[in-house]
Every structure is written in C-alpha cells, then in structure tokens.
C-alpha cells in the first residue's frame, strides 16, 4: 500500500520538548519520529540528526534549534528541540519557535531538577499555554512507589507555576527503549507508551486559533498621502483580516483614533480583503498623513491598548553574540524595538538583583517614554545605538 500523501487538511500544531539537560528530550524527539514512521506518519530522524541542530538567527540572536515534523491520525505537528539550556531560554523568549504546547520530559530516575523548574517558569512567563509530561527512563526505576513520588513532585511543580498540575496528563515510558524497538522495525510495549503520549498531546493541547481568525492587527511601517484618495498606511498584517468598510483604531504614541477602511491594496491592486501575512496598503477615511506614524498599529477597535509600563522576561546577549561587554544596572536606558519602532525606556531590576551580566536571563520592569500598543506576549528587542543587546517578551502589563 502506498503511503498516504501529506494531507493539508489536518490541523497544524506547534510543539516542542522541554526539560532538564540529559533527561532525554532529544531521545524522545527521535523516538516519536521513529515510532510514527512505522505507521507511515513521519520520517525517521536519528538522534544525531536532531542533536546537531542548525543555528538560526532570530532578532540578531543565534539559536541552535532542531525542527522535525510528523503526523498523528488527527494532526500535523511541527516539533522543536534545542540542544543546550541557553538555546531553550533564547528560543522561548524570542519566540523563534512559537509553541502551542510543550512536552516536559522528566527523568523518572532523577525527578525534577533545576532546569525542569526553569523551563516551567519560562513557559508560564512567555505564554506556552499547555504542558503534557513524559516521565522518561521508566526502565531504570524498579520501585513503583518511586515513580509515583516523582509524578506527585512534577504535579506540585506545575501547580506552583499556575499550570493545572492535577489535571496534566503524565505518561511514563522509556524513549531509548522505544527508539531501539522502532529501529528494529516494530512498535513494542515501549513504543505503545510513546503512542499513548501522542494521544494525550492530541487530546490535551487544543488546536490553536489560526492567525487569520484573531483580531485584526497591522503594525504601521509607512504612511503616504495620495491626491484625491486620502491617506494610505502600509505594513504587514500580523493577524486577523481587514476589508473595506471595517472600523479600525490607530493605537500608540498618541491618543487612540478611530477611522474606517476605504480601500485595501496589494501591489497596487484592489483586494477584497487583506489577511495575516499579507503586505498591504490600507486607505483610511478622513485621516491626515501627519496623524499616523511608524510605530503605531492599526487594529480591530478595543482589541489592543496603549501602555508604557510593563514587566518582561529578557535574555541579554553575551559578548560572543555581539552583545554588551559589561553588566547593566537599574535605570539602564536602552531602546525597546517593538514591531516597527524603537522607543526609549528605563529598566528596573527585581529586588535582590544588583546587576545583569551579558548572557543572563532576568525579569525586568520597563517604563517607556511613549505609550505603544502592548499585550501579554508582545516580543521586543533591546537595542543600544542600533545594535541588538537583548530580546524579551511582555509578561505583565502594569499601566
């Protein structure tokens, strides 16, 4: 029987493996692809193939990330795995690989470790909405009570960071044993546990809302005035869609303005509607060119509001990555590059943190000199004289 061809009709979900170093994240990633390949739903990827992650640049930061893809009966998955702890931190903060959910890998033989805690905290801060747990290395634990103890610890840890610890699916197994079985050509008892894990992922991690179904938002890149037609604002639609007759708000920098869309164009052609991912020009009724500038956003009324004070989780580039060579302190005033513009802001460090060294990640409070459209999960770069020195994500809006 010929293998089914790739089916675009299955819903697409982005996930990744997280957890402490050497607990088996990469082995599990390899095992999932191997077990599903026996069902004609994936291409088998070797451990080394995943572990030698190519380096990618995201906002001027080099991150090593491996991407694999596979399907279950119900879904198509893109799965990311990072080789080093620092790569996870960078990946989650820059949103290089946006995750709809994560598989937390915990070694049943060791229990939760410092990076287990840190990855759960990061998931909470950067907005990874759902976590499913795989207790790995079950073959190395003879005592059932020990296994149950680790499970309780993991649930308590999840609850401590406001994940529903009691309701989180936890599947025990051995990624290595499943991988060995699959390489020998069969789905055995360990492979079944990997399939059980994927069934839990299918059921527990909801299908994400597609970008086109979200509230319309377009960062303003440029503004022109066209004689006889009015003001055209150009940019790439970040989410949602826009069509002639829609009411929109212009948010950020100055007081929020309301207006109506009188035209949507792409490459000088009229469009019925523009949607997420399109680079468009939007004609606005009665808006003057000088009332709109780069750094504002066009959006569905009421969907996003302007703010100037927020908390963020940031990663500070190391010297080797082209970042600062020296630490910074409270009252450091860099530029925050959000969507299309730089806004100066001052940083306050958390109590007990004297300074931040290049290569650190830390939670900060920022006060900008102008209000701009912000919400939980908004990504930003931190720049100094045009070069990127850090990256971050908004974790809490203060005012």
Curated annotation (Swiss-Prot):
Chain spans, region G4: 136-139
Residues annotated as binding GTP: 19-26, 81-85, 136-139
Domain annotation tr-type G: ranges: 10-209
EC class (word): hydrolase
GO molecular function, one term: GTP binding
Subunit organization: Monomer.
Name of the protein: Elongation factor Tu
Keywords: Cytoplasm, Elongation factor, GTP-binding, Hydrolase, Magnesium, Metal-binding, Nucleotide-binding, Protein biosynthesis
Originating organism: Helicobacter acinonychis (strain Sheeba)
Residues that, per the record, bind Mg(2+): 26
Gene designation per UniProt: tuf
GO cellular component, one term: cytosol
One Pfam family this sequence matches: GTP_EFTU_D3
Lineage summary: Bacteria, Pseudomonadati, Campylobacterota, Epsilonproteobacteria, Campylobacterales
